[in-house]
Every structure is written in structure tokens, then in C-alpha cells.
């Protein structure tokens, strides 16, 4: 465990014991930190997604500092954002997020290294196996190497399964077959041996879904047996109202695949969602391998799907019933 991790582990206890300063409470408008409560239950964090622009908007920064213990960059670490033109890197937005997190003792989740979407055209146009292998290895080494030791976990591969559990068609699977998964994870382990390496996907929201059973769990078991260094599975958790209990059960099914960790990585729940947020929180608490939950944003109108009011804070940064349901689930 790094020294920063030790400090993170001690901070919530102090936060629970001491009264919250009035000025801080006004800035964040929540009575209790769900991150502090989560850590008091033995988990690592309750986090949120953000990026440079959001950190400079309204009360986002103050709320993240007070109520969340982990951050995931929503877009700034995706391949197209970092290297849309080959060899020309745009580091500034991602650097800003990392610097914010480090200076405020927040854990970081790197998102994401290998993904079929938001991918530069020059990568999509590669047809040679050896060339694509080298490009993957260099990308992973360069990106992870820039923040080595600062990022706790990485989504190494993202959204690689179809709904029936088969592998999604992409430049990676077309040119390399399933072997791109091994190539990416081995490169990631070499780039930062201490980082936790994840495979991440959506619609893993029912323990009986084919995408979970025939896709994620079956493949991860096979890859682990072959020595692929996968540490964890991330279930994104982009839910509709009423799906919270299904995801809670699915967390256990994912943990049973043999990975060391599971996490809910991009949680948002459309509709009347307080009961669902509570169910997901309790589901993570019930599974020892579940290390934490990340909400996919702070307030509703900054969400990628704002029409369903899916997050924990409303447009005025007031904590919603969903936030309070998480607080109650953690008591």
C-alpha cells in the first residue's frame, strides 16, 4: 500500500468524527460525505466522473472535494482526446484532472486505454497484425507511463462484448482476434506493475444476462487461466429505474469469475432512482471483492443523459433523495 493510500484510509474516520465547517457545508450542500461513509464500511471509495471543464464549473470542485474520494476522467484520457493525430499528444486536460486529484488526495481511475469508440481514424485504418500490436503496446506504455504511480486502477479494455456474449467487431478484434486483450493487459502490467487492471463494460446488470455469463465471466475465467493479468471487472451501471437489484446481484456473479476486485464504474440511474441507488450500494457492501462505486457525474444537467435526472445532485447542486438513500444504506 502506498503512503497516499494509507492517508486516504485514515481521512474518513476524522471526517466522521469532526463537525463539518459551515462554509464547507454551504459549498457542497450535503450533510454527510458518502465517500467517508463508504470507507467507514471498509470500501476504498465512492467516486465520480469529471474533467477539467467540469472542475471549473459551479460547485463541482467543492462537492468532489467534500463528498467523493475517487475521480474518473469522463473523456480526457480516451485515445482520440490524447492522440487524434499520430504522435501529437494533448495532455493538458488529463494532466489537470490528475493534478487536482493528487493535490486533494483523491484516488484516480484511468479511463480508458483500448476502446472501439472515440478512437483516432489512423488507428482504425491499421490492417497489419504486427503494426497494430506495436501501436497498442506503445499507446499503453506512453499513457500509463505518464502518470505511473498516480493512478490506482485502469480500464485497460472497454466495451468489448456484444449483448449475446460474443466479441464485438472492432479494428482490434478484426486484426488480432481475442489476442488483443492479452496484448493490452500484458503491456499495462509492464507499464505500471502496481496499478489495478480492469476490463469494463455496460449492461452487466443482471446475473443471468448472456453478456455477463457467456461474455464477461466466461471469457475472464478463460483469460485468467491463460495467465492474462486481469485484476478486476468494472460494471458501468447505466441503469433505468427498477434495475438496481439486478446490478446488486450481478456484482456477486462478476466477483465469482475469480478476479481480485470488482467495481461499479459509471453509475447513473434514470427515473425515480433513490431505491435503486440504495440497492446498488448495498450490493457492493455485500460483496467483499467490490472495492467501490463511481457515479458518472455530479449533477443531473451535466450528465451525458440528463433527461432522466440520473445523478445524485440536482441542477442547483442540491443532494437529491438518491444521495440521501446512499447515506442511509451506508449507515
From Swiss-Prot:
Disulfide bonds: 284-290
Residues at the active site: 159 (proton donor), 266 (nucleophile)
PROSITE patterns named among the record's database cross-references: GH10_2
Primary enzyme class: hydrolase
Glycosylation sites: 105, 301
One GO BP: xylan catabolic process
Main subcellular location: secreted
Pathway(s) per entry: Glycan degradation; xylan degradation
EC code(s) of this entry: 3.2.1.8
One GO term describing the cellular component: extracellular region
Matches recorded under InterPro entries: GH10 (IPR044846), GH10_dom (IPR001000), Glycoside_hydrolase_SF (IPR017853)
Domain GH10: 31-329
Family classification: Belongs to the glycosyl hydrolase 10 (cellulase F) family.
Protein name per its UniProtKB record: Endo-1,4-beta-xylanase 2
Gene source species: Pyricularia oryzae (strain 70-15 / ATCC MYA-4617 / FGSC 8958) (Rice blast fungus)
Amino acid at each position: 500500500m502506498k503512503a497516499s493510500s494509507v492517508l486516504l484510509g485514515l481521512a474518513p474516520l476524522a471526517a466522521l468524527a469532526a463537525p463539518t465547517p459551515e462554509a464547507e457545508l454551504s459549498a457542497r450542500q450535503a450533510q454527510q460525505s458518502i465517500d467517508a461513509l463508504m470507507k467507514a464500511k471498509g470500501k476504498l471509495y465512492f467516486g465520480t466522473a469529471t474533467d477539467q471543464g467540469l472542475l471549473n464549473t459551479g460547485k463541482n470542485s467543492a462537492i468532489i472535494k467534500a463528498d467523493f474520494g475517487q475521480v474518473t476522467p469522463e473523456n480526457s484520457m480516451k485515445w482520440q482526446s490524447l492522440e487524434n493525430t499520430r504522435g501529437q499528444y494533448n495532455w493538458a486536460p488529463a494532466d489537470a484532472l490528475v493534478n487536482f486529484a493528487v493535490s486533494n488526495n483523491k484516488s484516480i481511475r484511468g479511463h480508458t486505454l483500448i476502446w472501439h469508440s472515440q478512437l483516432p481514424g489512423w488507428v482504425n485504418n491499421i490492417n497489419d497484425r504486427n503494426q497494430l500490436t506495436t501501436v497498442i503496446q506503445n499507446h499503453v506504455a506512453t499513457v500509463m507511463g505518464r502518470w505511473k504511480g498516480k493512478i490506482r486502477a485502469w480500464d485497460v479494455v472497454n466495451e468489448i462484448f456484444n449483448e449475446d456474449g460474443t466479441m464485438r467487431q472492432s479494428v482490434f478484434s478484426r486484426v488480432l482476434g481475442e489476442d488483443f486483450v492479452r496484448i493490452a493487459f500484458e503491456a499495462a502490467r509492464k507499464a505500471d506493475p502496481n496499478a489495478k487492471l480492469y476490463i469494463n463494460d455496460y449492461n452487466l446488470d443482471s446475473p443471468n444476462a448472456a453478456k455477463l455469463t457467456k461474455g464477461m465471466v466466461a471469457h475472464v475465467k478463460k483469460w485468467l487461466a491463460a495467465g492474462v493479468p486481469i485484476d478486476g471487472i468494472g460494471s458501468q451501471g447505466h441503469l433505468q429505474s427498477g434495475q438496481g437489484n439486478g446490478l446488486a446481484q450481478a456484482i456477486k456473479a462478476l466477483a465469482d469469475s475469480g478476479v481480485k476486485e470488482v467495481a461499479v464504474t459509471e453509475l447513473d440511474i434514470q427515473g425515480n432512482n433513490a431505491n435503486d441507488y440504495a440497492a446498488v450500494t448495498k450490493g457492493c457492501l455485500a460483496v467483499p471483492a467490490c472495492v467501490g462505486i463511481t457515479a458518472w457525474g455530479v449533477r443531473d444537467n451535466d450528465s451525458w443523459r440528463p433527461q432522466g435526472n440520473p445523478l445524485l445532485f440536482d441542477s442547483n447542486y442540491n443532494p437529491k433523495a438518491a444521495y440521501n438513500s446512499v447515506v442511509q444504506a451506508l449507515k
